[in-house]
Design a protein with these regions (language model features):
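Bacterial lipoprotein signal-peptidase II cleavage site
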Residues: 4-7, 16-40
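C-terminal amphipathic alpha-helix
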Residues: 42-84, 88, 130-179
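Polyanion-binding interface signature
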Residues: 91
Length: 179
C-alpha cells in the first residue's frame, strides 16, 4: 500500500509541475508579446507626430498667406482684363504676407517626439522659409520672377519627403495644403 501512495504522490507532483511549467511558458509568451507591441508603438507615434507637425506647418502658413494666394491667383489668370491684373497694392500686400510666412516658419520649433529627424525637419523648414522670403523679395520688384523661390520650395518638399520616406510613409506636398 505504501508503494501505491508513493506512486500516487509522485504522479500528482509530476502533473502539478507539468501544469505549472506550461503556465510559465504562456506568461513568457505574453511578456514577449507585450515587449514587441511596446517596441512597435513608438514607430506609430512618430508617424502620428510627423503628420501633426506637417499639419501644423500647413496651418501656420495658411494663417498668414491669404494675400499672397490672392496675388498668385490674379497673376495666374489667362488672358485677364486689365482691371483683373494684380496691382502694386496687391503686390505689396502679397510681399508682406510672404514675409510674415517666412518669419513664422523661422520661429517654428521641431517637437521633441521627432528628435530623430530634427536636423532634416529643421533643414526642410528653413528651405520653406527661404522660399517664402524669396517670394517676398521678388514681390518688391515691378516684374517679380518666382523661379528661384519655386526651386527652393521644391528642395524643401524633397527634404520633407525624405523624412516621410524614412518612416515608410508617402511624401506629402505642402503646396497642395497651402494653395
Amino acid at each position: 500500500m505504501k508503494k501505491f501512495l508513493v506512486s500516487l504522490a509522485a504522479l500528482a507532483l509530476f502533473l502539478g509541475l507539468a501544469a505549472c511549467s506550461s503556465n510559465d511558458e504562456s506568461k513568457t509568451e505574453e511578456k514577449d508579446t507585450k515587449k514587441t507591441e511596446e517596441a512597435a508603438a513608438p514607430k506609430n507615434d512618430v508617424k502620428k507626430d510627423l503628420v501633426k507637425f506637417y499639419n501644423g506647418l500647413a496651418e501656420k502658413i495658411n494663417a498668414k498667406d491669404g494675400d499672397l494666394n490672392a496675388y498668385e491667383a490674379k497673376a495666374a489668370k489667362k488672358d485677364p482684363k486689365p482691371e483683373d491684373l494684380p496691382t502694386a497694392e496687391d503686390r505689396a500686400k502679397a510681399s508682406e504676407s510672404a514675409a510674415a510666412v517666412a518669419a513664422e516658419l523661422n520661429s517654428t520649433q521641431i517637437p521633441v517626439e521627432l528628435k530623430d529627424h530634427q536636423a532634416d525637419l529643421e533643414a526642410a523648414v528653413k528651405e520653406y522659409a527661404a522660399a517664402y522670403q524669396a517670394k517676398a523679395d521678388e514681390l518688391k520688384k515691378d516684374a517679380p520672377n518666382f523661379e528661384a523661390a519655386e526651386a527652393t520650395y521644391t528642395k524643401a518638399e524633397e527634404a520633407l519627403g525624405k523624412v516621410y520616406e524614412a518612416e515608410k510613409m508617402f511624401p506629402p506636398s505642402l503646396g497642395n495644403q497651402v494653395n
